Every structure is written in structure tokens, then in C-alpha cells.
Amino acid sequence: MFTLPLPGLLERWISGWCLTRGIVRERAANGWLVHVCADTRLAEYFLVSPTSEELAHVVNLVDGRSDVWVTVLGGLPKAGLDGLAAVTYDERMMMTELMPRTLPAGIEVESSDRLVIAIAEVNGDTAARGQAAVTGSDAVFDRIGTELAFRRQGLAGKIMTGLEHWAVSQGADTGLLMASAEGRHLYESLGWREVAPLRTFSGHRPK
């Protein structure tokens, strides 16, 4: 794993992630509160290796709120999770040095200012897509996915290459993303490296 300071990396990732999704963030609870406003949750706290006291404070804030998530990057206290319900277990923050790439055949990129969407179509249907945003010298990659019927064809890798092609053209030299267990294998094959583990929880539903 990389050994760069996690608070700074999280701030850099959040900056780009919020840009890709058109959402806002604010400092809160020794971390960040992002107003996600998605079907899955309304808001999400992000903490880096919190102390037991810091975690307990956030648990109290989300008590009874299944629509508010808590994501912890790095170490996690063993105590203090009783007020939370697990959402994900085995995700990672990942990072890479971006390199100039040729836009793969069949990949279309649609960009506006600091944002881009890469799309792969098969017979007129969207088979795979992904998006990215550039903030400073960072490119944050997000929502990389392939439709079930088109998996195992290398399309996600081409989407990543198309996004990298665009990001480098915008002056980015570092890539950041949050990877699921499934996605991590793809990113590792493309040269991405793990930075730190992350786990996500939600507040328990009221009884």
C-alpha cells in the first residue's frame, strides 16, 4: 500500500467525487459530511482512522438514520460499532500514476469542463460506462460498470483507459478511486495500487 497521509488523500478524493456527482460537502465530526442525496442514502460521513471517541460521536449523530452512512478509511476501533449496520466490508481506496493513453476503439467520451463520461456501446446499447473529474492534478474515477450481458469482454478496462486518456489531456497525473472487492481485481490488473481499506456503515433503522 501507499504510505501517503490519508486525511489529505481523502480530501482530494472527496473533492473530485463531489464534482463527478454534482453534490456538496462540508467539514464535520473531524472528517467530512457529504450531502449525497441518492436513492441509497441522503448523506454520508467520511472519517480517517477515528478514535473511539470520534466514532462514538458520529454513531450518536446517525442513530436511527438508515439513510445516513458512515465510511471509515484506514483503522477502525473494535468498540463503538453497536449503533451501526454494515453496508460494505472489503473495499479499498486505490491510487495510480496516470500515463498518456490512446483512446480505445469503440469508446466514446463526452466531456464538459472538468467532467467526462466514457461509454462503450454494442449494437446501439450502452454496454459499459464510467465517469471522472479532474481537480488540480488528480483525476477521480467513479461509477465504472459493465452491464451484465456484456461482462468478461474487457469493456471496463477500455472504459478506464478512455477516462485516463482524457484525464491526462486535462493535466492530471494521479488517479484516485474507491474500489469494491469485485472492481479491485480490474484496477490491480491496470496497475492501480491499494492505499487503505475502507468500510461503510449505516445507522440502524428505528425499532
Describe the predicted segments one by one:
Residues G83-I117, V122:
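Acyltransferase donor/substrate-recognition loop-hinge adjacent to the catalytic core
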Residues E110-L148:
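A conserved beta-strand-loop-helix scaffold within acyl/acetyltransferase catalytic domains
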Residues F46-T51, I144-R151:
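A short, internal acetyl-CoA/4′-phosphopantetheine-binding micro-motif in the GNAT/acyltransferase core
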Residues F141, T174-A179:
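Conserved hydrophobic beta-strand within the GNAT/NAT acetyltransferase core sheet
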Residues Y89-P100, M178-A181, T200-K207:
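C-terminal "cap" of GNAT-fold acetyltransferases
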Residues L76-A85, G157, S169, A181-L198, ...:
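Conserved active-site alpha-helix within GNAT-family acetyltransferase domains
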Residues M1-W69, L73-A79:
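N-terminal charged segments
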Residues L55-V59, T146, R152-H165, S169, ...:
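Conserved acetyl-CoA-binding loop-helix of GNAT-fold acetyltransferases
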